[in-house]
UniProtKB/Swiss-Prot annotation:
Gene: AacuO
Biological or metabolic pathway of the protein: Secondary metabolite biosynthesis
Species classification: Eukaryota, Fungi, Dikarya, Ascomycota, Pezizomycotina
Sequence similarity: Belongs to the avfA family.
Molecular function in Gene Ontology: monooxygenase activity
Gene3D superfamilies: 3.10.450.50
EC top class named in words: oxidoreductase
Keywords assigned: Monooxygenase, Oxidoreductase
One Pfam family cited in the UniProt record for this chain: SnoaL_2
Presence of the UniProt keyword Oxidoreductase in the record: yes
EC number: 1.-.-.-
Protein name (Swiss-Prot/TrEMBL): Monooxygenase AacuO
Function of the molecule: Monooxygenase; part of the gene cluster that mediates the biosynthesis of the tetrahydroxanthone dimer secalonic acid D. The pathway begins with the synthesis of atrochrysone thioester by the polyketide synthase AacuL. The atrochrysone carboxyl ACP thioesterase AacuM then breaks the thioester bond and releases the atrochrysone carboxylic acid from AacuL. Atrochrysone carboxylic acid is decarboxylated by the decarboxylase AacuI, and oxidized by the anthrone oxygenase AacuG to yield emodin. Emodin is then reduced to emodin hydroquinone by a yet unidentified oxidoreductase.
Signal peptide limits: none
InterPro entries attached to this UniProt entry: Fungal_Meroterpenoid_Isomerase, NTF2-like_dom_sf, SnoaL-like
């Protein structure tokens, strides 16, 4: 049974709003307890992340990318199948250069429509192949994701 379209639409709106604000905690609050994040394409061999793993990595990412701006290009909501798709691009500043990433985010809602149960993200592989190792090194050099996130409590949308 699918959730009412209005419930899914409200969840989708909260998800996009948190993403636009670049607010990790608000974004995570839209995820179900059994949430899964899948990075696509599968050829990148990025393991599926659980909510607990995302709760560690996402705040560190948000703290690392400054002056974040998101541009939503398309949103498609398919309430009959409990799904939505968002095509977006974002820009920002990293400690080592620019952040320029395109996304196609495929969301699956919980049965009641109140949370996002699964997020499958098709990412710009050229950017990701460069970013991934540099982000890993940055986290390692700065005490890990929890330490990076803790140091990023200032206004994350402006230059620090």
């Amino acid at each position: 049974m699918t959730a009412p379209a209005s419930t899914q639409a409200a969840t989708l709106k909260r998800f996009i709003s948190a993403w636009e604000k670049w607010d990790a905690q608000e974004w995570i609050s839209t995820f179900s307890d059994d949430f899964q994040q899948v990075t696509l394409p599968h050829s990148l061999s990025v393991p599926v992340r659980t909510r607990k793993e995302v709760e560690i990595v996402l705040p560190a990412l948000v703290a690392t990318v400054k002056s974040y701006q998101l541009q939503i290009h398309h949103v498609i909501h398919d309430p009959d199948n409990n799904k939505a798709v968002v095509y977006a691009a974002s820009t920002g500043k990293l400690p080592w250069g620019d952040w320029n990433l395109e996304y196609a985010a495929f969301l699956t809602f919980t049965d009641d429509g109140g949370k996002v149960a699964r997020l499958e993200e098709m990412l710009d592989t050229a950017f990701l192949q460069d970013f991934g190792p540099k982000f890993g090194k940055y986290l390692e050099e700065n005490g890990g994701p929890v330490a990076v996130a803790a140091g990023g409590k200032q206004d994350l949308r402006s230059e620090a």
